[in-house]
């Protein structure tokens, strides 16, 4: 997996890539580190209702999920990944892009149709209306 800048597996995929059963934050950290050691620069493991965990080789960033009234989880991972990629492409820091992606995905699961994606203004409102705190662990 040399030359991969970002990979965004879910818990199951991270387990397959790393050989580590991912079931909590600590096992996600071990899996992210193992994937990084295979040459991936940035690993972002999506953890469903537990949020996401990123590792860039120097620090881990745990971004909790935003509270949501879940109607349909179909497309939640795609919504998260699209918002993350958009934020990174716009030059946002990984921390900022993760926050935006988490808020975006929380709004996406509140619709009954997986193709209904939230508007930017709704995402910003969600971010501003909730005390959101990421946890950063140094390696």
Regions of interest found by a model, annotated:
Residues 25-139:
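Conserved phosphate-binding/catalytic region of the ribokinase-like
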